[in-house]
Amino acid sequence: KNDHQLEIKKIIKKNIVGIKKLSSERLLDELKKTFKSNCFIKLCEIDFSYEIICAVFPEFKQIELFRKLNDYTKNNLYSLDFTFFLSILILDKTDNSDYFFYKFNISKKKQKRIKLIKEFFFSKKQSTKLNAQNLRKISYFNGKEGLVDILNYKIFTSKKFDKNLINQINYFKNKE
């Protein structure tokens, strides 16, 4: 892993405006390629690359999470889909996700998945307890995919690793 030369860093930073002028579809497509190539975590660990990603995608309010993932989340991030990956990056208590949907033209189906996670964790109306009764209720109203997204989001955003959440995911995935 070679560090970028200082002169190259200056040139890239100087021309970052050109990257920002690319179409939102192209930027999202390039991000998807980066995610599928399994190198996003490595890029976040390199300070210069992290700085560039933050400059190109200022909507990624939770990108800091990728600098301090536990072993389980590092090993399992790429087994999850791109929509869930986006939810980790953009969800917070603000309307940041709505702006992201507007700017990047995300499909209604994908928006619904991301909004479900946001509603569960950031809405004051709902209980965020992940007890058996609440999980069954989520599964009934939002399906297995919604439930698994909520559990995975909890795993990826928690400071401590909770094996019980993994067991819950496996239980509901195997349940009809």
Where are the regions that the model predicts?
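Internal alpha/beta core interface subdomains
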Residues: 1-19
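C-terminal subdomains that position terminal phosphate/3'-OH groups for nucleotidyl transfer/ligation
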Residues: 14, 46-176
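Divalent-cation-assisted or electrostatically stabilized phosphate/pyrophosphate-binding catalytic cores
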Residues: 20-21, 25-29
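Conserved phosphate-binding loops in nucleotide/dinucleotide-binding enzymes
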Residues: 28-36
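Catalytic core of bacterial c-di-GMP phosphodiesterases, primarily the EAL and HD-GYP domains
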Residues: 40
